[in-house]
């Protein structure tokens, strides 16, 4: 059985192709990495790396052992996690991909509380993801609508419903619209996520109305910018009712709902996690998400 620290040193050298970069990544002296690599090569009776200019390249033996080093390290991590779960210890790292419009306000609070509860856990949070990226496999994806990526299970967290909002400043000089058909007479702030050839709005008493695509000087896919533009009196625009209520709580007197009772079709908020059994840290975080769902998402 190979020394795990030596295998980690070799793996880092494979990844970074440089003794200096690998030492920096592992936060170890270069002399330590060199010594561990030399010991590993002596134990295996094979040269694993060779220098070409300023870069390190794998020998034939190194290419073979690199495959097994990945497996050794993965197995070591899994065994460590299994032992820690015996004591309900949450360690390691969670890699999350989260839609930018879900981070502010809601997820940031969930993450903060979760990390305070589990002081040794590391979080890597990204707001960009493409299905075509086959190498990158996050532990959890939280997204607005979206089909489940290959190899992931979908769980619906809730729904957003969009409604039209204006600011008191804007309505001080204009009549407040009472029906969606009147929106065509107002400057429109277009939220790209809701832009269609036409947008179906629904009312519990008056049925449906198809709002045509409206010309807009400002188009944005960022909720914070959308809300700011509306609050500044630039026109009328759509916001998720949950987000608008939170914005109004934080900035009283900023937003007023227009055409009361008219809302868009529900938009799904989903999380996606890999098939199979999950480590304790992911299971607990998914539970935390379920418990933190706002009532307005139901």
From Swiss-Prot:
Domain of life assignment: Bacteria
DNA-binding region: 19-38
Pfam families: HTH_1, LysR_substrate
Species this protein is from: Vibrio cholerae serotype O1 (strain ATCC 39315 / El Tor Inaba N16961)
SUPFAM superfamilies referenced in this protein's UniProt entry, alphabetically: Periplasmic binding protein-like II, Winged helix' DNA-binding domain
UniProt keyword Transcription present: yes
InterPro entries membership: LysR_subst-bd, Tscrpt_reg_HTH_LysR, WH-like_DNA-bd_sf, WH_DNA-bd_sf
Record-annotated HTH lysR-type domain positions: 1-59
Protein name: Iron-regulated virulence regulatory protein IrgB
GO molecular function: DNA-binding transcription factor activity; sequence-specific DNA binding
Phylogenetic placement of the source organism: Bacteria, Pseudomonadati, Pseudomonadota, Gammaproteobacteria, Vibrionales
């Amino acid at each position: 059985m190979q020394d795990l620290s030596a295998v980690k040193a070799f793996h880092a050298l494979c990844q970074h192709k440089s003794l200096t970069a690998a030492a920096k990544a592992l936060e170890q002296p270069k002399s330590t990495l060199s010594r561990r690599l030399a010991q590993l090569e002596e134990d295996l009776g094979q040269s694993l790396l060779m220098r070409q200019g300023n870069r390190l390249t794998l020998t034939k033996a190194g290419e073979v052992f690199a495959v097994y080093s990945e497996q050794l390290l993965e197995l070591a991590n899994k065994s460590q996690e299994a032992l820690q779960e015996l004591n309900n210890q949450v360690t390691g790292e969670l890699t999350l991909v989260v839609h930018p419009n879900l981070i502010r306000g809601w997820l940031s609070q969930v993450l903060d509380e979760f990390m305070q509860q589990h002081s040794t856990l590391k979080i890597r949070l990204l707001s960009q993801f493409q299905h075509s990226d086959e190498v990158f496999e996050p532990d959890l994806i939280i997204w607005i609508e979206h089909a489940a990526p290959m190899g992931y299970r979908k769980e619906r967290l809730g729904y957003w419903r969009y409604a039209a909002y204006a600011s008191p400043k804007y309505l001080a000089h204009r009549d407040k619209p009472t029906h969606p058909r009147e929106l065509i007479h107002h400057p429109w702030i277009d939220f790209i996520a809701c832009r269609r050839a036409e947008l179906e709005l629904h009312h519990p008493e008056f049925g449906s109305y198809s709002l045509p695509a409206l010309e807009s000087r400002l188009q944005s896919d960022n909720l914070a910018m959308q809300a700011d533009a509306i609050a500044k009196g630039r026109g009328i625009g759509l916001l998720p009712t949950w987000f608008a209520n939170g914005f109004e709580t934080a900035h009283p007197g900023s937003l007023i709902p227009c055409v009361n009772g008219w809302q868009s079709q529900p938009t799904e908020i989903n999380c996606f996690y890999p098939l199979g059994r999950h480590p304790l840290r992911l299971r607990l975080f998914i539970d935390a998400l379920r418990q933190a769902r706002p009532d307005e998402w139901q």
